[in-house]
Amino acid sequence: MSRQVSPSTDQVYGLQRVTRIWGVSRATIYRHRHHLDDVRRKRPGPLGAMSDKDLVAEIRQLLQDSPFHGEGYRKLWARLRFAGIRTSRRRVLRLMREHGLLAHQRAGRSRGSRAHDGKITTERVDVMWGTDLTSVMTGEGQAALQRAYASCAHGHAAVIAVDHCSAECVGIHASHRADRFETLEPVKQAVRERFGAFAKGVAAGLQLRHDHGSQYVSHHFQSEIRFLGIESSPAFVREPEGNGCAERFIRTLKENLLWVRPFATVEELRSALIAFKRTYNQTWIIERHGYKTPAQVRADQIGQLPMAA
């Protein structure tokens, strides 16, 4: 009303005159006006093809159907796009935050100066693999789990895929013991599958990243990989980031299988690991590769290789 024009004076009433006649303070008017502005104020532009309520329902359904736990809003945004639902990452983040759907984040801590430049990923597959192990409790006791996690190097192309490039799990194995023989098993699996044989020099040009565990620095382990033509690439001492690709895969494995499911026997564990490897390689998506799966990254790179004469 303060902006309306008086018919007698042909002038606006003004806020001061209106509040005096109404018997209220101008501060009260400003406070209520500010509240209405907040209610009306929304992000400019169209809302999109789907309302917030419907989009939250789609996000919940994706989380329920996903074989993995702890995927963040970026991967959920990518999976929405795969399903034909177009929206922005910021909107997905806002809705997941408002409804308590964000993945749990662990706070980091300072560990002093780093002994490496922080980059261990490669540009092509089958240039570097990483290997590591973790322990698992079963009904038979504590089983040792080993898994080889592949990677690749700059400009060096091979016919097969491995981890530090594609993040593909190339070998996985479970056993009662974690000795030098058992820890070599996932590497043997990967060599047979990716290089087609287990022979002298068959994997020449490949590097294997591992820690300084007694199994990996043993004479038997080093002799076997040297026979295959694989170059040993040990990580820095007390620098787990140096074997970060393998460490990250173990975390994914724990969060999605080992910590959420009991196992009666080692054979049951082994079968579950093989199934997880297949699911992971086919459905886990990697942000740095444009939200492609490890299998898609490998297929794309194989398609770029020149045909043999």
Model-derived regions: residue spans:
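Charged DNA-binding/catalytic regions of mobile-element recombinases
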Residues: 1-309
